[in-house]
Amino acid sequence: MNDRKWVTSSVMLVTLSACLALGLSGCSSTKPDAQEQSSSSSPASSDPALTAEIKQSLETTKALSSVHVVVQTTGKVDALLGISNADVDVQANPLAVKGTCTYNDQPGVPFRVLGDNISVKLFDDWSNLGSISDLSTSHVLDPNTGITQVLSGVINLQAQGTEVVDRIPTNKITGTVPTSSVKMLDPKAKGSKLATVWIAQDGSHHLVRASIDLGSGSIQLTQSKWNEPVNTN
């Protein structure tokens, strides 16, 4: 893969991660199959209170107009193709993303999404790499999927106590994410994975952090500055 295609794919995946964190409905690359839908719709082993807490956090996240997102990885995450972390501001309706990432061990590489266009600044000028809809896989902009599939699909929920994340007291909850949801972040995923979410205790129901263990590595998304003004121009 040449450098241009490599950067394009990397930025695309980080953009999807940002979309997932914000809760935009049009950021999924796949739909669950019938078996997984049946399994995820009947989380018999989960505490109803935890299920309700996850659902409330989902609704709160979907209602955000903007958020700051930090994407971090550990280990080897092949799907990110050289991106190890990103620090971005995300605006919803319409989607706009602007920030920096560490690409191929080079920190501070700027990138942005404005409208449907992805641009990256490797040297002195912004270069348009194409559109999200052209570069992403089938159904990536399907309005019926997205963060709803990720969070509502989590089963086997277990409370793990409380934890302070970025000076915010949170409830820590673990669970299992079905394969179809994992594929949003790792298209090659072949099984369900463990996930952890941290939800603010202050009554806001904000999703402060979410982490998914992909086996060879993990992807962690941390949110802050909910609904605060962001500059994505």
UniProtKB/Swiss-Prot annotation:
Record's keyword annotation contains Transport: yes
UniProt key word Secreted: yes
Processing after translation: Modified by Lgt on Cys-27 with an S-linked diacylglycerol with a mixture of C16 and C19 fatty acids (palmitic and tuberculostearic acid), signal peptide is removed by LspA, modified by Lnt with an amide-linked mixture of C16 and C19 fatty acids.
Keywords, alphabetical: Cell membrane, Cell wall, Lipid transport, Lipoprotein, Membrane, Palmitate, Secreted, Signal, Transport
Location in or out of the cell: Cell membrane; Cell surface; Secreted, Cell wall; Secreted
Lipidation residue positions, type S-diacylglycerol cysteine: C27
Residue stretches of biased makeup (Low complexity): 35-49
Leader peptide range in chain numbering: 1-26
An annotated GO BP: lipid transport
Pfam families, sorted: LppX_LprAFG
InterPro entries: LolA/LolB/LppX (IPR029046), LppX/LprAFG (IPR009830)
GO CC annotation: cell surface; extracellular region; plasma membrane
Lipidation, N-palmitoyl cysteine type: C27
Region annotated Disordered, chain positions: 31-50
Protein's membrane topology: Lipid-anchor
Family of the protein in this entry: Belongs to the LppX/LprAFG lipoprotein family.
Protein's job: Might be involved in translocating phthiocerol dimycocerosates (PDIM) from the cell membrane to the outer membrane; PDIM forms part of the cell wall.
Domains: entry comment: Forms a U-shaped beta-half-barrel with a large hydrophobic cavity which is large enough to hold a single phthiocerol dimycocerosate (PDIM) molecule.
Protein's UniProt name: Putative phthiocerol dimycocerosate transporter LppX
Organism of provenance: Mycobacterium leprae (strain TN)
